[in-house]
Amino acid sequence: MYTKAVLLAFVGSAAAFNAPMMTVRRDAIATGAAAAVVAPLLRPAGAKMATDSKAPLIELFDERDGCKGPAANKASDVGEPGLCVKVSMQKVAMNAAAAKSVATNYMRK
């Protein structure tokens, strides 16, 4: 009785094994590896890493205290009158003293 059950288990496991599936999977992995090798060569020449360290600088101008100047443009109805936001990209310089201060004061466990 047990031998028949073991024999049926072996036949069932052999039927579940699919050799062509293993070949397809192997081919897919090889194709993916080849694509990973070739991908850097296919990128456009204009796609380069930015080497200039620029970051957005946000300046807020508040004229709500009564400072009235000549209006060059018609005031919009969006937002709060008297507030202006200027965003520009500026080069960021390294500050070793500030980096050391952050490391000593904020990077503690």
From Swiss-Prot:
Post-translational modification as stated in the protein's UniProt record: Contains three phycocyanobilin chromophores with binding mediated by both the alpha and beta subunits.
Cited InterPro entries: Globular_prot_asu/bsu, Phycoerythr-like_a_sf
Membrane-protein topology: Peripheral membrane protein
Gene Ontology CC: one annotated term: phycobilisome
Record keywords, A-Z: Bile pigment, Chloroplast, Chromophore, Electron transport, Membrane, Photosynthesis, Plastid, Thylakoid, Transport
An annotated GO BP: photosynthesis
Subcellular location: Plastid, Chloroplast thylakoid membrane
Binding site for (2R,3E)-phycocyanobilin 1: 6
UniProt: (2R,3E)-phycocyanobilin 2 binding residues: 17
Binding site for (2R,3E)-phycocyanobilin 3: 16, 20, 27-28, 39
Entry annotated with the keyword Electron transport: yes
Primary localisation category: plastid
Protein family membership: Belongs to the phycoerythrin family.
Subunit and interaction comment: Heterotetramer of 2 identical alpha chains and 2 identical beta chains which form 2 alpha-beta heterodimers within the heterotetramer. The two alpha-beta heterodimers are rotated to an open configuration in contrast to the closed configuration found in other cryptophyte species due to the insertion of a single amino acid, Asp-65, in a conserved region of the alpha chain. In the open form, the central chromophores are not in physical contact but are separated by a water-filled channel.
Other observations noted: The light-harvesting system in Cryptophytes contains phycobiliprotein complexes. Unusually they are composed of either phycoerythrin (CPE) or phycocyanin (CPC) but never allophycocyanin (APC), with only one type of biliprotein being present in any one species. Unlike cyanobacteria or red algae these proteins are not arranged into higher-order phycobilisome complexes, and they are found in the thylakoid lumen.
General function of this protein: Light-harvesting photosynthetic tetrapyrrole chromophore-protein from the phycobiliprotein complex.
Protein known as: Phycoerythrin alpha-1 subunit
Organism field: Hemiselmis virescens
Classification of source organism: Eukaryota, Cryptophyceae, Cryptomonadales, Hemiselmidaceae, Hemiselmis
